[in-house]
């Protein structure tokens, strides 16, 4: 008998929210001052995927690194 073990992996956007807080930037600012998509913010809140271009845009707006936007979490 072979047991299959599923390894859960996920990308967390928690660093993004921490970076926004440190920079004093709100979702309102991103949407209405930077033209960022409210739908994309919704997707991030619900742990859904976003594009590399979106990550690039957020890094530019927030003047930060990719690790300040996303974190890879592996559930062992």
Residues covered by each model-derived region:
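Short, basic-rich loop-to-helix N-cap that marks the start of a DNA-contacting helix
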Residues: 48-60
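Alpha-helical residues within the helix-turn-helix
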Residues: 21, 32, 60
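Residue-level detection of the helix-turn-helix DNA-binding "recognition helix"
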Residues: 21, 35, 46, 74
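A short, Lys/Arg-rich alpha-helix, primarily the initiator
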Residues: 1-29
